Design a protein with these regions (language model features):
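HIT superfamily nucleotide-processing domains
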Residues: 1-125
Length: 125
């Protein structure tokens, strides 16, 4: 079910629980600002979720409340994950669903990193 990108943060969401170690995940990267783990239902050969460690619901929330260090650290983490997974040369896609119209499903900011094959056009017309 889609969630609002402007809703208050719910610390019971699945990603908050992963951050606290209450739910297992196959982590492929972590640092002081972010963690990345394999998506449970991959849409491409490589499908990783990158999430900030802080309690942010959406890009709007993150860009308004996160420190400069958190923002920089998160962006750098996304790039580091792509490099670590060998996706820099062949290419990859980043996707962040924010809010109801975009069908955001978890009320914790996250970026999908897709790769491992040619992905084709992003949006069918």
């Amino acid at each position: 079910m889609p969630v609002s990108g402007t809703a208050p943060y719910d610390d019971g969401n699945v990603f908050a629980r992963i951050l606290r170690g209450e739910i297992p995940s196959r982590r492929v990267y972590e640092d002081e600002f972010a963690i990345a783990f394999d998506d449970l239902n991959p849409q491409t050969p490589v499908h990783v979720l990158v999430i900030p460690r802080g309690p942010y619901v959406s890009w709007a929330d993150f860009s308004a409340r996160a420190s400069d260090a958190e923002i920089t650290g998160f962006v750098r983490a996304v790039g580091a994950v792509a490099r670590q997974l060998g996706l820099e040369e062949p290419g990859y896609r980043l996707l962040a669903n924010t809010g109801l119209d975009a069908h955001q499903e978890v009320p914790h900011l996250h970026v999908h990193l897709f790769g491992g094959r040619p992905l084709g056009p992003m949006i069918a017309r």
